[in-house]
């Protein structure tokens, strides 16, 4: 059961999108609009050029772009383009979440569920996943259904399914 939960958490981490940008000149990225920089970062991510993705996401995150903040948190969380640093991942996920990022909240939930940087706290993870599930986020719904299944609480899964209609 715990192995299945771990598998689903890993699957969630890899399914979270790392958004990106369009041209090839990273040095020009600050002069591009946000969508162009996101497109360029996506091209680099598709090629697994994580340092280039990081170099695009970091300034955007500092500028307050919540998608970039959540993506930067994931780069720190996975150690892509930078050294793995759960503290920085938590900080960037929190920044994004405070500004309304569903992905930021979900990623914080995963950190609480796994105990990465924070003390493992399933109840806190559930609270975060419930907040984003209310926004019809399917990743959060999947995480909650797995937690409820492992806790042998099928009635909560049924209730969640009925609410999502």
Swiss-Prot record:
It is a single-pass membrane protein. Keywords: Membrane, Transmembrane, Transmembrane helix. Gene3D superfamilies: Tetratricopeptide repeat domain (1.25.40.10). GO terms for cellular component: membrane. Its main location: membrane. The keyword Transferase does not apply. It is found in: Membrane. SUPFAM superfamilies: HCP-like (SSF81901). The chain crosses the membrane at residues 7-24. PANTHER family: ERAD-ASSOCIATED E3 UBIQUITIN-PROTEIN LIGASE COMPONENT HRD3, SEL-1-LIKE PROTEIN. This is Uncharacterized protein HI_1625. It comes from Haemophilus influenzae (strain ATCC 51907 / DSM 11121 / KW20 / Rd). The lineage of its organism: Bacteria, Pseudomonadati, Pseudomonadota, Gammaproteobacteria, Pasteurellales.
